[in-house]
């Protein structure tokens, strides 16, 4: 392959894709390798759709793989990473030289300064938390001989506390620690005292003057390979599994994210998670708080599973999306109307850009103020902070320069019709509609879940949003007559796109050394082309292209 131009290969793989000229050959080769090594995408089975199908599978299957992530430990009280007062924020205060929060998981930074990591370690160290209902459900499946393997991305060791025996800790855990120099290994209890006293634990066997003789918990850091145990187990399990259940994971961290595409495609797959995973095709999607969903499944399974239930009430199913409450409708009516302009060549109203940018800023600020004020009165602080961050996005409209030639109002004498709707104008047109979004699950009463045919269920806690016309007032929507589709936000069936998926595509380019042997396969389909198209467009905007597991996945 020496002397071969990777652009030639990319042209053959993706004929309609033209990589930007500024991408170097190394990056292009990484894209080629990523495409060729990606397992083919699985298609949903048409004969498995309902929660009844899921329960039947749980009753009949004997070799179940359960893949778990952050969602199974949310209810255990483990500290949050990203909130205003979370671990990341406090580390930034205590360690101002920390370049970014995730640097504490970088092995090179750890060698230079292990203190940030050990401050974090104290907060989630084993022995402080109890297993969730999800952990207990998996442990009972293990006890009954139904569990083939639990692959967890978490590092909290709660699987062991729950009694799960057939466990693979994909990203390591705090259960043991080993010396960076001599690899001497000890149990977590041997270094507990030092960690809770905020003393960097030292190796008892290495010379005292050896600066790197540090007892590091055996967590997979950036720059380290996954445990060999993961690869060996996956090589065997992929041919034995008869059901895959994903619980509480976004599946954006490779190689674990490749598991659903690496097992035989006829094996049924069930998702239990707060949000959908649009890059994968599950047969049944149970969306919401993981413990709430597992509680309902335990009711339906009966026997020993019913004894695990935290909530004695079995939920009732509804098939019609609940309407907005009167309070929500009143709030929506307070959104400012989008200015309209009747163009000379169209009978339908077209929204235009106010000619004074101060008008935009005023409208946005007023709406933001109303939105935040309402949140502060009606919702807990954590919810206010989360939604305020979303609302803050729309302050960026203030920076739009309406006199910029790239930003043309409808009716402008310059530019053709296709240039009238610029990116900035699209943002302006859509911001009221985005403000109007809210979680469908918040409309459910305490004993309901919503069935969205053919295979999606919305439980409490589901991060699935609605913006359909029957939910929003006409003054706050983008309109239904647009042919361009630029204003159409994702509907109930289409969750908001997460740019981290694009980032994860690039993260995955460099992690081939960590890819399990079972993740073979070749070929590029439409999904590959779309991913590459988006990825190369975002390349210059990405600042972190680490390839090893993202520890924030645990939270």
Curated annotation (Swiss-Prot):
Polar residues composition-biased segments: 345-354
Gene3D superfamilies: SIR2/SIRT2 'Small Domain, TPP-binding domain
GO biological process, one term: triglyceride mobilization
Reaction(s) this enzyme catalyzes, per UniProt: N(6)-acetyl-L-lysyl-[protein] + NAD(+) + H2O = 2''-O-acetyl-ADP-D-ribose + nicotinamide + L-lysyl-[protein]; N(6)-propanoyl-L-lysyl-[protein] + NAD(+) + H2O = 3''-O-propanoyl-ADP-D-ribose + nicotinamide + L-lysyl-[protein]; N(6)-(2E)-butenoyl-L-lysyl-[protein] + NAD(+) + H2O = 2''-O-(2E)-but-2-enoyl-ADP-D-ribose + nicotinamide + L-lysyl-[protein]
Chain spans, region Required for interaction with the sumoylated form of CCAR2: 64-67
Domain (Deacetylase sirtuin-type) ranges: 44-304
Binding site for NAD(+): 69-88, 153-156, 248-250, 273-275, 290
SUPFAM superfamilies in UniProt: DHS-like NAD/FAD-binding domain
Nucleus listed as a keyword: yes
Enzyme Commission number(s) of this protein: 2.3.1.286, 2.3.1.-
PTM: Methylated on multiple lysine residues; methylation is enhanced after DNA damage and is dispensable for deacetylase activity toward p53/TP53. Phosphorylated. Phosphorylated by STK4/MST1, resulting in inhibition of SIRT1-mediated p53/TP53 deacetylation. Phosphorylation by MAPK8/JNK1 at Thr-338 leads to increased nuclear localization and enzymatic activity. Phosphorylation at Thr-338 by DYRK1A and DYRK3 activates deacetylase activity and promotes cell survival. Phosphorylated by CaMK2, leading to increased p53/TP53 and NF-kappa-B p65/RELA deacetylation activity.
Cofactor(s) this protein requires: Zn(2+)
Main location, first listed in the record: nucleus
Statement: the UniProt record of this protein carries the keyword Membrane: no
Subcellular location: Nucleus, PML body; Cytoplasm; Nucleus
Biased composition annotated in UniProt, kind: Low complexity: 473-493
Motif (Nuclear export signal): 241-247
Stretches with biased composition (Acidic residues): 494-514
Entry-annotated residues carrying S-nitrosocysteine: 203, 206
Cited function: NAD-dependent protein deacetylase that links transcriptional regulation directly to intracellular energetics and participates in the coordination of several separated cellular functions such as cell cycle, response to DNA damage, metabolism, apoptosis and autophagy. Can modulate chromatin function through deacetylation of histones and can promote alterations in the methylation of histones and DNA, leading to transcriptional repression. Deacetylates a broad range of transcription factors and coregulators, thereby regulating target gene expression positively and negatively.
Assembly, per entry: Interacts with XBP1 isoform 2. Found in a complex with PCAF and MYOD1. Interacts with FOXO1; the interaction deacetylates FOXO1, resulting in its nuclear retention and promotion of its transcriptional activity Component of the eNoSC complex, composed of SIRT1, SUV39H1 and RRP8. Interacts with HES1, HEY2 and PML. Interacts with RPS19BP1/AROS. Interacts with CCAR2 (via N-terminus); the interaction disrupts the interaction between SIRT1 and p53/TP53. Interacts with SETD7; the interaction induces the dissociation of SIRT1 from p53/TP53 and increases p53/TP53 activity.
Stated family: Belongs to the sirtuin family. Class I subfamily.
The protein's name in its UniProt record: NAD-dependent protein deacetylase sirtuin-1
Origin organism lineage: Eukaryota, Metazoa, Chordata, Craniata, Vertebrata
Gene field: Sirt1
């Amino acid at each position: 392959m020496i002397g071969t131009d990777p652009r030639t290969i990319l042209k053959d793989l993706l004929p309609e894709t033209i990589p930007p000229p500024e991408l170097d050959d190394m990056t292009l080769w990484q894209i080629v390798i990523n495409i060729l090594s990606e397992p083919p995408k699985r298609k949903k089975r048409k004969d498995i759709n309902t929660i009844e199908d899921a329960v039947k599978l749980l009753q009949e299957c004997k070799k179940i793989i359960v893949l778990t992530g952050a969602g199974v430990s949310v209810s255990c009280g483990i500290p949050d990473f990203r909130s205003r007062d979370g671990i990341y924020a406090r580390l930034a205060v205590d360690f101002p030289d920390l370049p970014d929060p995730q640097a504490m998981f970088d092995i090179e930074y750890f060698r230079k300064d292990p203190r940030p990591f050990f401050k974090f370690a104290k907060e989630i160290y084993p022995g402080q938390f109890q297993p969730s209902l999800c952990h207990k459900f998996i442990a009972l499946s293990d006890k009954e001989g139904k569990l083939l393997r639990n692959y967890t991305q978490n590092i909290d060791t709660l699987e062991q506390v729950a009694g799960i025996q057939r466990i693979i800790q994909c990203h390591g855990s705090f259960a043991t620690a080993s010396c960076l120099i001599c690899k001497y290994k000890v149990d977590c209890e041997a270094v507990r005292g030092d960690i809770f006293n905020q003393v960097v634990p030292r190796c008892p066997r290495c010379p005292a003057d050896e600066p790197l003789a540090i007892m590091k918990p055996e967590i997979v850091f950036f720059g380290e390979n996954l445990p060999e145990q993961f690869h060996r187990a996956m090589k065997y399990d992929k041919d034995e599994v008869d059901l895959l259940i994903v619980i509480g994971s976004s599946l954006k961290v490779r190689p674990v994210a490749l598991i659903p595409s690496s097992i035989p495609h006829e094996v049924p797959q069930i998702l239990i998670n707060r949000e959908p995973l649009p890059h994968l095709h599950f047969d049944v999607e149970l969306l919401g708080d993981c413990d709430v969903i597992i509680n309902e499944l335990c009711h339906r399974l009966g026997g020993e599973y019913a004894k695990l239930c935290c909530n004695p009430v079995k939920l009732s199913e509804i098939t019609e999306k609940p309407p907005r409450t009167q309070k929500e409708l009143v709030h929506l009516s307070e959104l400012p109307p989008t200015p309209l302009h009747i163009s000379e060549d169209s009978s339908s109203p077209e929204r235009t850009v106010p000619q004074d940018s101060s008008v935009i800023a005023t409208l946005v600020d007023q709406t933001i103020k109303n939105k935040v004020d309402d949140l502060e009165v009606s919702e807990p602080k954590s919810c206010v902070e989360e939604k305020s961050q979303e609302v803050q996005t729309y302050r960026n409209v203030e920076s739009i320069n309406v006199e910029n030639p790239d930003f043309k109002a409808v009716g402008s004498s310059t530019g053709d019709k296709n240039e009238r709707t610029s990116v900035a104008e699209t943002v302006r047109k859509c911001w009221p509609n985005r403000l109007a979004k809210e979680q469908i699950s918040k409309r459910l009463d305490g004993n309901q879940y919503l069935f969205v045919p053919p295979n999606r269920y919305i439980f409490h806690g589901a991060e699935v949003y609605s913006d359909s016309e029957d939910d929003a007032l006409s003054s706050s929507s983008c309109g239904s007559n647009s042919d361009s589709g630029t204003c159409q936000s994702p509907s109930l069936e289409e969750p908001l796109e997460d740019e981290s998926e694009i980032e994860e595509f690039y993260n995955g380019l460099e992690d081939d050394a960590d890819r399990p042997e079972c993740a073979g396969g070749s070929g590029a389909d439409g999904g590959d082309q779309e991913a590459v198209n988006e990825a190369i467009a975002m390349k210059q905007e990405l600042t972190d292209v680490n390839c090893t597991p993202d520890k924030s996945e645990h939270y």
